[in-house]
């Protein structure tokens, strides 16, 4: 890729205007004064942006400007270097052409400034392509180690430069994508280039089986587009259903240890079962001991004389059976106790030594007061009835006193 990129725009600044040295003041010019044109830059006429009216009949003086480098400023790179190498006209002014060293455009700010000044046409694509083919220190996780890659392409960066480059990359034709990743990995053998640079991998060279099985089926870096850069030849491959069996047989045939290659193989192999121990032959049965020699039979003992039989012994007298013990006599129950007569409690007589007569008298007096007819009689004959009541009360009191004393 060429290291030169261009940006094209229309100059608006007149800060670079200069004097054409044409006389214009009175007494210095006349109608016959020659008109002086604008100068040139790189063989192209400078920008004539206007005229200045001169004295009386003198011809007007042209206003000219050189290309302004400020119209091309996109900022310095990460090493504080200005990428602008030359400013000239694009045919003629005010069409300006800015020439840059693309290798000094390596910051997001420069990319944004270039886009704002010149748009996404022209060499913007080349600027982004060169920027994205540079390496980054902010990387995604390497699935092989479980830690972040120490260095990677900007396509695998986890910062904003990664977002920019992935967006640009996905908009490119497949042929351009292949060229970009191959150019990057040819210069930078970073961990995300394990698929593109797989020919440098010892495990790949050990197990490569020609073109029978696509590398995107069995070689792990080529089967993981999220972590590694891929070319179109290994993307979305058609894989045979038994490709893991084929790889397993190749590993066995080439006497390769599975543990040494399992991280690079896109298959899950079960560990080999431990070797079965060889059966031990059964021990020889013990030999039976030899039969001992049979001893000579002992001589038979001489016959003994038969003793005479014992005389019969007299039989003992029979023992009489024991007499049964009579049962003990039953206890005599005590005679029954006759019931005792319960004395009849006498009903106590009514005690007449009370004020019964007086109470009766008081009750009669109250009855006379309570009943309406009695109140009427009392109200009509008050004094007479009061006298009668006093006499009756005295008689009742006397009768009660007699009863209490003599009865």
UniProtKB/Swiss-Prot annotation:
Spell out the family assignment given in the record's similarity comment.
Answer: Belongs to the IIV-6 337L family.
Name the record gives this protein: Putative membrane protein 047R
Give the UniProt subcellular location, in the record's own words: Virion membrane
Origin organism lineage: Viruses, Varidnaviria, Bamfordvirae, Nucleocytoviricota, Megaviricetes
Does the keyword Protein biosynthesis belong to this entry? no
Q: May I have one GO cellular component term? A: membrane
Q: What is its main location?
A: virion
What species is this protein from? Answer: Invertebrate iridescent virus 3
Annotated region Disordered: the residues are 265-337
């Amino acid at each position: 890729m060429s290291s030169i990129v261009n940006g094209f725009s229309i100059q608006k600044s007149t800060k670079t205007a200069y004097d054409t040295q044409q006389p214009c003041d009175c007494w210095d010019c006349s109608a016959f004064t020659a008109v002086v044109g604008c100068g040139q830059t790189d063989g192209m006429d400078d920008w004539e942006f206007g005229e200045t009216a001169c004295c009386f009949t003198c011809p007007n003086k042209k206003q000219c400007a050189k290309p302004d480098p400020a119209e091309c400023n996109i900022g310095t790179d990460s090493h504080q270097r200005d990428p602008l190498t030359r400013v000239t006209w694009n045919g003629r002014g005010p069409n300006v052409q800015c020439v840059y060293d693309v290798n000094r455009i390596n910051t997001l700010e420069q990319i944004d400034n270039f886009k704002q000044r010149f748009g996404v046409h022209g060499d913007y694509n080349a600027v982004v392509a060169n920027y994205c083919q540079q390496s980054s220190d902010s990387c995604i996780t390497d699935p092989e180690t479980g830690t972040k890659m120490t260095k990677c392409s900007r396509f695998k960066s986890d910062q904003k430069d990664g977002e920019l480059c992935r967006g640009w990359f996905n908009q490119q034709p497949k042929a351009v994508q292949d060229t970009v990743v191959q150019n990057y990995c040819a210069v930078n053998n970073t961990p995300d280039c394990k698929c593109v640079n797989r020919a440098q991998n010892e495990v790949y060279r050990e197990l490569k089986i020609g073109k029978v099985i696509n590398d995107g089926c069995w070689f792990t870096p080529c089967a993981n587009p999220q972590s590694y850069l891929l070319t179109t030849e290994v993307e979305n491959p058609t894989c045979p259903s038994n490709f893991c069996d084929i790889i397993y047989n190749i590993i066995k045939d080439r006497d390769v240890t599975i543990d040494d290659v399992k991280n690079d193989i896109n298959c899950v192999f079960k560990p080999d079962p431990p070797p079965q121990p060889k059966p031990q032959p059964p021990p020889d049965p013990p030999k039976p001991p030899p039969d001992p020699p049979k001893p000579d039979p002992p001589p038979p003992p001489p016959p003994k004389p038969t003793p005479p039989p014992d005389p019969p012994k007299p039989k003992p007298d029979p023992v009489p059976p024991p007499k049964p013990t009579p049962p003990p006599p039953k206890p005599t129950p005590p005679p029954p106790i006759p019931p005792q007569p319960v004395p009849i409690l006498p009903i106590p007589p009514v005690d007449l030594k009370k004020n019964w007569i007086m109470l009766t008298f008081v009750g009669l007096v109250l009855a006379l007061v309570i009943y309406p007819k009695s109140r009427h009689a009392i109200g009509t004959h008050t004094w007479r009835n009061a006298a009668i009541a006093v006499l009756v009360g005295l008689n009742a009191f006397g009768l009660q006193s007699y009863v209490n004393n003599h009865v």
